[in-house]
Amino acid sequence: MQQLEFYHIAFLILAVILEIIANILLKMSDGFRRVWLGILSLLSVLGAFSALAQAVKGIELSVAYALWGGFGIAATVAAGWILFNQRLNYKGWIGLILLLAGMVMIKLS
């Protein structure tokens, strides 16, 4: 594995952003009834995995995947709240807190 450099982190950030975009587009596609939004969602997922593949060249897979998934979920929750007026119940908030705590623990290990 190469040494961690800025561009590995940049690819990880890009992967998170593309995952969030994919999730938003998927919601907006209304179950692929709006085909072009569904196709854009799939292309965003492809881009996210491509960026993640570049990120893991310098970041351990377990760390990169945990950060990608965790930040993606947290940001998707925020986007759902802002764009679609979706709210978490208390169990959802507990799950999100546990997820974020788990990301911190993986990063510190």
Swiss-Prot record:
Say which domain of life the source belongs to. Bacteria
Q: Which InterPro entries match?
A: Small_drug/metabolite_transptr, Small_multidrug_res, Spermidine_export_MdtI
Alphabetically sorted, this entry's keywords are:
Cell inner membrane, Cell membrane, Membrane, Transmembrane, Transmembrane helix, Transport
Q: How does it sit in the membrane?
A: Multi-pass membrane protein
Q: Name one GO cellular component term.
A: plasma membrane
Functional summary from the UniProt entry: Catalyzes the excretion of spermidine.
Q: Which NCBIfam families match?
A: PRK10650.1
Q: How does it assemble?
A: Forms a complex with MdtJ.
> Any idea what this protein is called?
Spermidine export protein MdtI
Q: Which organism is it from?
A: Yersinia enterocolitica serotype O:8 / biotype 1B (strain NCTC 13174 / 8081)
